[in-house]
C-alpha cells in the first residue's frame, strides 16, 4: 500500500513538471465559430500547439491556424492574431518546440511503464541517430551487490524520478544547439547526487553544448533565437542569424566550414564591432598608370544580392562579379550602347535584330546616336536608359545580351527595377496633345516568364498619371515590389503608390517638404522604404536647412479605397548636414547609411527608429569620390545579412566595409570616427 502511494506521488510530481513545461506551448491554436452572437464570426482560440511556427512579425502560432487564416482572408492581407500586424507570412517551423511537444507526449505515455520495474535503473537512450524520440530502457547491472548499493542510495524515490526528468530535458535543451550529440545506452543516470549538484551539472553540460554547435540538417534547421537586433521588423531573407549572447570559441574550432558555424561567428563579431569597427577593402576596377587622369563613369549600380555591380559610360557598360571570399571584383561581361556584348571588349558579339524584343519601331538613327545615362542592376537584368528616350534590358546570365528595347515618346528621367526582376518602373514627363502642358507619368513594365521556354517576356506597360505637373525626380521600388515611392523636382513632393494590385495602382500617401528652391538646390534626392516595414521611410535632399528625415508613413493604418495617409516625422538627422545625395537602409532596420555631396559616407544606427529622443549613434565610415549632382554620386548597398556595406563611386573604385570580419582588437580591424552620440 505504501509503495502504491509512493508511485502515485511520483507520477503526480512528474505530471506537474510536465504541465509547467507544456504551458510554454500554450499559443494560438485554432479558429472556432462564435455561435452565441448569432453570426458566423470566428475567433482565435488558444491551446497546446504541437506544430509551432514563427511569422515574419516574430510571433509564434500554430501552422494549421495560419493556413486557416489564409483561407479565411483569401482576398485580403493576413493579419497576425497576436500583434495584429497585417500582411504577415509564415517564416519557418520552430523545430525545437515541435520536438519538445512530441517528447512530452512520449514521456507521458511511457511514465507508467518505467515505474513498473522498481529494481532496475532507467537509462535514457536514443533509439537511432536520426530519430528525435527518446525511450526508457532498463540498465542491467553486473552484480546484485551493485543493485543493493544503488537501492540504498535511492532511498528517496522522488529524487530518482526527478533526476531522470532533469536528464531528459537536459538532452532536449542540448538538442536545440547540438543535433549530433549522441547519448549512448551506457550513460547511466547520476543517482548519488543531491538536487543542487544535479542542477549545477545540468547547467555545465548545457553551457558546454553551446560552445560547439553542430547541425545535421542545414537545409531545414533555421535558428530563430535572434531574427533581428531591432524591434522594428525581423529580417526577411533566407539567412539565419545566431544569438549574440553565447560564448564563441576561437577560430581554430571552425575548421568544418559549416555555414551555421560561420554565421554564428560573424554575428558575434558583428555584435562587438558595429558600428565603430570594421575591416576595410578597396579595389580599383581601372587602375591609373603613370599619373594619368582616372576614368570617370556616368552611373553605377550594385545588385541586391551583392554578388555583382555595373558601371556605364556614355557608350559602354561593364558588369563585375564580387568574389565572396576576398570581395575582389572581376569583369564577367561588357558591351556597347550599339548592342554588342561579350565576356570582354576583345570578344564582343553583334546583336541580332531578330532576337530583340521591342515595343515600338524606333529608327536606326536613334539607336546608333543615343548615349547612356542611368543604370540599375537586379539579380538577373541590367537596365540602361539615356538620350533618345531609349530603355534597354540586358540579361546578365547571357553575357549581357540585349533582350528588350523600349523607345518612349517622352524623356525618361529616372528608372528602377525590383530585386526579383519582375517589375521595371521609370518616370517620364509627357505633354498634352492639345494644350502642350507637361504631365508627370510613371510607367510600370512587368517581366513575366514563358511557361514553356522560361524566357522573359514583356507585356504592354502600365502608365500611371500623377495628379501633379511637376516632373518626377526620383523613383524607387520597395524590397518586395509592393510599393513605389517617387518624388518631384520643383515642389519637392514625395508620394507612395501601392502596387499590390499591379493593374490597379493606388496613391496611398502624399506629402510635400518645404525646402529651399535656389539654383544650387536639387530638392529631394532619395526616398527609401524600410525593408519589410513600409511604415518607415527615409528621405534625403540637397538644399539649405533640409536634413535627412525618417518618417512614419502610416500607410498600414488607412481605411477605405480613397483614403490617403499623411506622414509624421520621427527622426531628423541634423548632425550630417543638409547636402545628402543618397541613403541605404540596413536589412536589420536599425541602421541607415548616408552619402553627402563631398563623398563622405555616414552610418546612423538606432534601436527602433521610432523616436527622435532615443539613443542613436552617427559615425563616419568612408570617404569616396565626390559628386556635384546626385546622379553622379556613389552607390550604397548593404548585403542581405546587414553586416557589410558596399560602396561604388564614379571613378570605378569599389569599397567594402566589413563589420563582421573580426574582433575590435584584431590587427586588421580599424576604428571609425564617431561624430554624434546620443
From Swiss-Prot:
Compartments, record wording? Cell membrane
Amino acid composition bias (Basic and acidic residues), ranges on this chain? 149-158
Compositional bias (Low complexity) at which positions? 127-144
Provide the residue span(s) of the region labelled Disordered.
111-158, 179-211
Describe its membrane topology.
Peripheral membrane protein
Biased composition (Polar residues) is annotated at 179-194
- Indicate the principal place this protein occupies in or around the cell: membrane
Q: What biological processes does GO assign it?
A: response to amino acid
Is the keyword Zinc in the record? Answer: no
Q: Domain of life, per the record?
A: Eukaryota
GO cellular-component terms in the record?
Answer: plasma membrane
Keywords associated with the record: Cell membrane, Membrane
Q: How is it modified after translation?
A: Hyperphosphorylated in response to extracellular amino acids and dependent on the amino acid sensor component SSY1. Phosphorylation is positively regulated by casein kinases YCK1 and YCK2, and negatively regulated by phosphatase PP2A regulatory subunit RTS1.
* Physiological role: Component of the SPS-sensor system, which regulates the expression of several amino acid-metabolizing enzymes and amino acid- and peptide-permeases in response to extracellular amino acid levels by controlling the activity of two transcription factors, STP1 and STP2.
Q: How does this protein assemble?
A: Homodimer. Component of the plasma membrane SPS (SSY1-PTR3-SSY5) amino acid sensor complex. Interacts directly with SSY1 and SSY5.
Q: What is this protein called?
A: SPS-sensor component PTR3
Provide the species name: Saccharomyces cerevisiae (strain ATCC 204508 / S288c) (Baker's yeast)
Q: In the UniProt record, what gene is named as encoding this protein?
A: PTR3
